[in-house]
């Protein structure tokens, strides 16, 4: 399912290392752009710079470097976490087939004894022993038992107090809090994230719908696919056709089209036939009114397109 997640994990907060250089106000000179020749020393360099840190690989081993090529974590691990700010968080790494955690200087802070590991969120992280997941603290002490089939990262959303985590048990997904109390029952084939949303897309008995923070059904489980945008509209798929509804279950665009793309500015691109070309589509606003026949779409979608047919 293509579900829009509208914000990033709170652990990845700082992207300053990837911004374009700014002008020095004292000299009016633009600082030189760092040379990227250092990348030739590696077999692979992560294409996206996050938090001034990139993942690198050489001879089948991974490490971390900054955007100038300075080695931050030695290239000696079978895998290593990327996209984290080293001054904010520990990161997992894999060595000799096992997972552990490193600090910002590359020192081992939790030994390599686990079969899987997830990002540390606050004081806890999900780790795997055998075929089950549990949660440990920063002293490597067990906080929650190893009883879960799968586990994600604890996070704090708009309403999520206490912090919740998406976990799987008995083949079904639900949410627990940091005490292990079940908040959303293990009743779903799939669950998306709440984050800052009031609602969560959920799949039950093979069909998609939406629930709220109290597990109340907001949108019934009758759709083959759902995709929301800004908590205003939901693109729904049913029996091979697509349409748009809102969170009050009101039909905005009838479920009678082959492809619908949710766009910015409350607009939608509609393909009434299976032929998804520029010549066969048109634009509608949120009220279902025709905006344009799409003659200008190629230029328009260079900046406005969010989804591709």
Model-derived regions, located:
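C-terminal motif of bacterial Sec signal peptides marking the signal peptidase cleavage site
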Residues: 15-17
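Residue-level detector of conserved, function-critical positions
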Residues: 21-309
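Sec-dependent N-terminal signal peptides
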Residues: 4-13
